[in-house]
Regions:
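Surface/interface recognition patches
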Residues: 1-167
């Protein structure tokens, strides 16, 4: 275990990815909080643009969208934005950190590779490089694990299921 200094820069990042790889990264500025409107402006609008560039024929049409049930994510304006742009929202049961790929895989993956940083800019740069260099197979493997977890969640009627997963 690496002991990190309390004086190292800390950062909040929103990462959007598909089974084929990274789609969009948004680093929150110091002091910035996520509310529904800046979630749309800083995350969902650029995400939608990126997907439309990656998939010029179909864009976001019929694309499944999963995020946890944090307050900004479940706001009516966010749901409306996603629906009007062709996304199908996959509901997230309350209190299920075992279901979100960011929680069960991505953030640990990033932390294991991070080196020490003395400033925010170098930390953002390294996080971006780590994310951009994750092999496509890793995203696919995580997507398959996510599907398994979704099935376990359904079987357990939305209750906690981490203890049922074969590590």
């Amino acid at each position: 275990m690496v002991r990190r200094s309390q004086f190292e820069p800390k950062i909040m990042v929103s990462v959007f990815f598909r089974s084929t790889g990274l789609v969009h990264i948004h680093f929150l500025k110091n002091g910035e909080t996520i509310n529904a409107h800046n979630y749309i402006r800083n995350c969902l609008e650029p995400l939608t643009s990126s997907i439309n560039e990656q998939r010029p024929t179909s864009g976001t049409k019929n694309m499944k969208f999963h995020h946890d049930n944090a307050k900004p994510h479940v706001a009516e304006c966010v749901k409306s934005y996603l629906n009007s742009n062709g996304f199908t929202i996959i509901r997230h049961p309350p209190y299920s950190p075992d279901l979100a790929p960011s929680d069960f895989w991505l953030f640990d993956y990033i932390k294991r590779q991070l080196t020490d940083h003395t400033n925010r800019k170098s930390l953002e740069k390294e996080i971006t490089e780590i994310l951009e260099n994750i092999p496509k197979e890793e995203y696919q493997k995580t997507f398959n694990k996510w599907l398994e977890r979704m099935e376990l969640c359904i079987q357990n009627q939305g209750h906690y299921f981490e203890h049922l997963i074969n590590k």
